Design a protein with these regions (language model features):
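Cell-envelope/extracellular polymer assembly enzymes that use nucleotide-activated donors
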Residues: 14-16, 44, 185
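Conserved donor NDP-sugar-binding/catalytic core segment of glycosyltransferases
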Residues: 79, 113-149
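Conserved nucleotide-sugar donor-binding
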Residues: 159-174
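Active-site nucleotide-sugar/metal-binding loop of Leloir-type enzymes
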Residues: 88-104
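N-proximal low-complexity "stem/linker" segments adjacent to membrane-targeting elements
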Residues: 1-37
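Short beta-strand-to-loop acidic/aromatic patch adjacent to the donor-nucleotide binding site
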Residues: 101-113
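Non-catalytic, C-terminal membrane-associated alpha-helical segments of glycosyltransferases
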Residues: 219-295
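Acidic donor-binding segment of Leloir-type glycosyltransferases
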Residues: 32-79
Length: 295
């Protein structure tokens, strides 16, 4: 049905946040303080305290006592840090208890300092174009007293630390996958279904604990396994892995990535996408590479 001039578009205003947290006593208060100072407040904030042994729970409880929209859920999982699976398992535990009447679902890390107008700006983007599925800013890290861009990904990619999804898009892609590479496959599937992913360079988020600071060697293998699960194939894995290793200034990491890729292939690791999606992803990746070569 064609819309008439008298019809008004319903504005998206309700954004709900889930924050997985494990031993984040040094940062969680900064993150929550930045949320309660937003020009547009969250509809709901769920902090999932995942087996913390420090004062994370106590700090969050101080906020829940003061702000009714902040809630705490305590869960128990294995103590070691595993990129991807552990954090998304915690996120999904939080997602289970959110008010389903949200417009935008947000996954945040517990070590961020977010600018006061961040979510007002995010909502503006969503309301300007109904085809926008995801919006995010950029991570900045402290280096010698200066906040510089944490340049680990292309500028059209939203970091896993701060993902915001339109509700019907989140549901269409089947939610988040508890697997390393979840923060890449989500965007690729959005594009597969014809949605747009938007990054806003005016939004600078302070990332208080740089990415990968607490990963062990097995995480490097998991990165390679993630490339396989994304359906990249060997050549795209080689190129993407080399690029990531060089950005991390650890060129030997590519060897671990490739080992993880081949182990996943040999073991028959289940992919995160079906064959049609895999074909789309490979074509998309190759086309992006060709664009960069052409300049």
């Amino acid at each position: 049905m064609l819309s008439t001039q008298n019809e008004k578009k319903t504005l998206l205003t309700k954004y709900s946040i889930v924050i997985p947290a494990h031993n984040e006593e040094d940062f969680i208060a900064i993150t929550l303080n930045s949320l309660v100072k937003q020009t547009v407040l969250p509809h709901e904030v769920i902090v999932v305290n995942d087996h913390s042994t420090d004062k994370t729970q106590q700090i969050v409880e101080e906020f829940t006592a003061k702000y009714p929209f902040i809630k705490l859920r305590n869960i128990l999982s294995k103590g070691e840090h595993q990129p991807g699976s552990k954090v998304i398992q915690a996120f999904l535990k939080g997602y289970e208890i959110i008010d389903p009447n949200y417009d935008i679902i947000v996954k945040l890390d517990a070590d961020l300092d977010i600018p006061f107008n961040y979510f007002e700006t995010i909502l503006t983007h969503f309301n300007q174009d109904e085809d926008i599925a995801m919006v995010g800013g950029f991570a900045y890290i402290d280096k010698d007293g200066k906040w510089i861009l944490e340049n680990l990904t292309d500028k059209d990619h939203i970091r896993g630390a701060f993902k915001a999804y339109r509700k019907n898009c989140y549901e269409k892609i089947g939610g988040l996958r508890a697997h390393m590479g979840w923060d890449t496959v989500d965007e690729l599937l959005c594009k597969y279904y014809g949605w747009k992913v938007v990054t806003d360079e005016s939004l600078h988020i302070k990332h208080l604990k740089p990415t990968g600071a607490s990963y062990n060697k097995s995480a490097l293998y998991k990165q390679g396994a993630a490339y396989y699960a994304l359906g990249y194939g060997f050549w795209i894995t080689l190129i993407a892995g080399t690029k990531l290793a060089l950005r991390k200034k650890k060129p030997t990491y590519i060897l671990y990535y490739l080992k993880g890729f081949f182990e996943a292939k040999t073991n028959g690791t289940k992919k995160m996408v079906n064959r049609d999606q895999e074909k789309f992803i490979r074509n998309y990746r190759w086309s992006k590479m060709k664009q960069k070569i052409k300049g």
